A protein has these predicted regions:
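Active-site beta->alpha N-cap acidic-glycine motif
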Residues: 52-141, 152, 156, 166
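Soluble non-cytosolic domains of exported or imported proteins
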Residues: 81-88, 111, 144-147, 174, ...
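CE4/NodB-like, metal-dependent polysaccharide N-deacetylase domain
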Residues: 91-104, 126, 143-174, 182, ...
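His/Asp/Glu-enriched short active-site or ligand-binding loop at hydrolase and phosphoryl-transfer sites
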Residues: 175-216, 250-258
Length: 258
């Protein structure tokens, strides 16, 4: 869970379709990231989230931050699970407040808890590949290693879900490389960043997690939480406050653009 600064506020632009790689410009995380949307609204994307099996269509290699729900959209993203102690509680809260989320699962956890993966899919949420082992040093490893971590996790998640593909790839700790982004995109998984790192994995207290969301939401729409990797009581309680607050502020729950 270290190195979380790596995926925050990266707004990549594709430069050279023939090469299929991008140059990353590290800039301020702002709502103008909505301009990075590569087509498709909530209706068209919702149907894609449940598409089982088959070959995946390639997607944009740039790191997504924007929401398909428009300028007042927010993306709830949940990392490192699923976990039987916490994922069901998170799912219950999302259902209570009519929120959708993107679950970035490790292959190990998905393989261990296929019932929870299926529960996530059945509730209308989206799946995201978070590598097999959550190695935050992946960007320093060989391309063969990166490929194995990403593609093995993809297979494990698809099997656990009963055939539903992950729609995104989030590098552990934001440890993306041009190679990993291109590989993921070629398998239909849009590289996924974040704008608000709640740092809930540090267990700073429920109030601190909530305050971080309220303070940093102006940075952009994609909010990072965790449902595994330790005691997530504070995360659950923070979501219990954050989800209704977002609705009261007029935000709509969406998914990251693809």
């Amino acid at each position: 869970m270290a190195r979380h600064g790596g995926g925050r506020g990266w707004y990549g632009k594709v430069v050279g379709a023939a090469l299929g790689v991008t140059m990353l410009a590290v800039g301020a995380s702002v709502w103008t990231a909505q301009a990075d949307s590569v087509g498709g609204g909530p209706a068209s994307e919702a149907s894609a989230s449940a598409a089982p099996g088959g070959a995946a269509e390639a997607v944009d290699v740039s790191i997504a931050h924007a929401s398909d729900a428009g300028p007042r959209g927010v993306n709830i993203t949940i990392d490192d699970g699923p976990d039987p102690a916490w994922t069901p509680q998170v799912l219950d809260l999302l259902d209570e407040y009519g929120a959708k989320a993107t679950f970035c699962m490790t292959g190990v956890q998905a393989e261990a808890h296929p019932d929870l993966v299926k529960d996530v899919v059945a509730a209308g949420h989206r799946l995201c590949d978070h590598s097999v082992s959550h190695d935050t040093g992946m960007d320093k490893k060989s391309e063969a290693y990166q490929s194995k971590e990403i593609l093995d996790a993809e297979r494990m998640i698809i099997k656990a879900s009963g055939g539903v593909r992950p729609m995104y790839y989030r590098a552990p700790g934001g440890a993306f490389t041009p190679y990993s982004r291109k590989l993921a995109a070629s398998h239909g998984m849009r590289p996924l960043g974040w704008n608000v790192d709640t740092k809930d994995f540090e267990r700073p207290g429920t109030n601190a997690i909530v305050a971080t969301v309220q303070r940093e939401l102006a940075n952009g729409p994609t909010i990072l939480f965790h449902d595994a990797g330790g005691d997530r009581t504070q995360t659950v309680e923070a979501l219990r406050q954050v989800l209704p607050w977002l609705k009261e502020q007029g935000y709509a729950f969406g998914f990251p653009v693809r």
